């Protein structure tokens, strides 16, 4: 978040004061760049490990405050936006020798500590780009971590947005969903990698980070499923962009920039271009009380915090973020790679980091200014294709040719990454180990996304989506304990989720969403035929505004049809005349047991599921309960 004490800007005076400090920070940074006031003799790397908290049923567990209380003496842990997410800030390492394995060990040791704390709370932790078992109602404001900065961020984004957030993501399935807050962004968990960069190299290195974002992402995708829908290979990219989009439709038309962005052009002169552009394009969301006098600090030879600049930078979400920081009293610049997902294992994550770090250095050595070899729009389009398709796509490279992503990585990029790591004197054993993980994963086309999708497709042939997603999450947790790279994992099995209980399932998780509907004006003959064609017994009836107004059953339709067929009225019988008007309904966040009680008590064969606007979003039928019963019987065998 850039600073612990931030708040929403509520008055013009607050805004003006913050803007003043923002301008001072820009001028101070400019002075520092011109006078060479940055550390250049050391290059460090760093990482941020985000993870999810889940209960014994593998559903989100909003316990990060309790976790922080138990882990309070460990300064590396911090909270995230949602109560079911946390983060570890790894200690920066000098980019040399055994830096990668040291980082891996530190993250594993801290995750072990988190596992122990979680076990005392009756919960578990999992590394994944998007938690498969997330449900829409998990993103109510009740799950917002209760810190002022998070309330301020959501309030500021909502104020700029002025309306609900629509998700529209298409892959194998399609997701159309509306949410009333940007908390939906908390579905994303990532593994951010940092590389310290000398000021003189910053422009070239930043542009390189843009070029390699696509191939690095294509080899590391791990977020293919959201709300039970199979979407992009790295759905985080689309979800993050849409969840914090503060623009109105008019602003879309004016081509105003989204706050989550890959960028629109190459960097040309310095890091200042990025910061100035962000101030021009993006309104201030948060502010903080700035105490320091940046120019007095510069006069005394002390590196300033540039807190106003940090706060504003933290509310602009570039996939490659330009960062200013201080290490051991010296100012430095770094590039934060925000592209990579969390998981599938720490071993996989460090391998991804090694690949990216090696490419950053190796391509700089081999090509220098990459803008001479590739148009920016090509790099941006590559990134989009990698997000959607992962390894199943073709990418353009610096030679102007198009390659299958896997071939490009194996034949061209891994050798360059190897040279880059060697240049920084990283131990040969580490290079072989981590780049070997990337090579095997790519050759076998076994990314985290591949594993999740193959497991999901297999499991849903004999279980409902909810149980399949719980099994995938359970298997992920088990495999992470062994730290075995994902390309060696067996597909998930239903037995992995031993604590699965149907009584803990919510309606949203097992209802049928592919619901056939009709209108009141449709004739009985047509709807009867539709039910026969689709082999269904219930059809929801909607009015012209899409509101649920009735329910048609096969018995009612057949009875009306048979009675009417022998009569000679001129006007055909309509569904509105025979349907069950204003049928009993249920909410998506009700428990399975509640649905069963209603259907048993009233001898219903179907129960429409509606939202708070009485819009139909699904249907619970006897078939849903039969599927769950069948799975329970299989477990008893």
Where are these regions (language model features)?
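Amphipathic alpha-helical coiled-coil segments that mediate homodimerization
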Residues: 468-471, 523, 527, 531, ...
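Tandem CBS (Bateman) regulatory domains
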Residues: 492-514, 528, 553-602, 612, ...
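Residue-level "edge-of-site" marker
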Residues: 130-131, 434, 544, 559, ...
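Cytosolic beta-strand hydrophobic patch enriched in CBS
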Residues: 518-520, 537-551, 586-588, 605-619
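Conserved helix-loop functional segments at active or binding sites
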Residues: 325, 365, 533, 563-567
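Phosphate/nucleotide-binding catalytic core
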Residues: 1-499
